Amino acid sequence: APLFYLALGGPVLGWVYKAVNTMDSMVGYKNEAYLYFGRAAAKLDDLANFLPARLSAGLMVLAAAVLGMDWWEGMRIFFRDRFNHASPNSAQTEAVCAGVLHVQLAGDAWYFGTIYKKKTIGDDKRPVEAEDIPRACRLMYGAAWAAALAAVLVLAGIRSSWRRCASPCTPTYQRG
């Protein structure tokens, strides 16, 4: 998401995004101390990450296909489990990764000495193993390269359109 906003609006939009994201990290908790301000920060962060999370999931599916990984299973798990998280954005890419790697992610978690029941993402086809880390990194790097290529193509298209439009679209004034 930070790179998305940097590409979209340069350093200013990148800093605005980072401020929203940091605010959510610092006060976006569901407790009395930060109930209202924290909720606003969390909702703003959810809104800011809505499009980048979904674009990233699509880029991960594309990268899996190019890298010869099981992109179809990644897509299947994405459509099934993409909402299996309290955050509307967190499970988007996690679901693709779980499907591509044929593992189950998330589930119950311990926070401050208390276990919280949470939904799982993916099918429990095999246990997660150390070799999954380089596979997940390969998928992530592939998605990053796909994002960079997409950004270059979009920016080149915008620049090309701007140049074509510059001459005929520029009004000419006649002194009269």
Q: What do the PLM-derived regions correspond to, one by one?
A:
Residues 1-23, 28-176:
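Hydrophobic alpha-helical transmembrane segments
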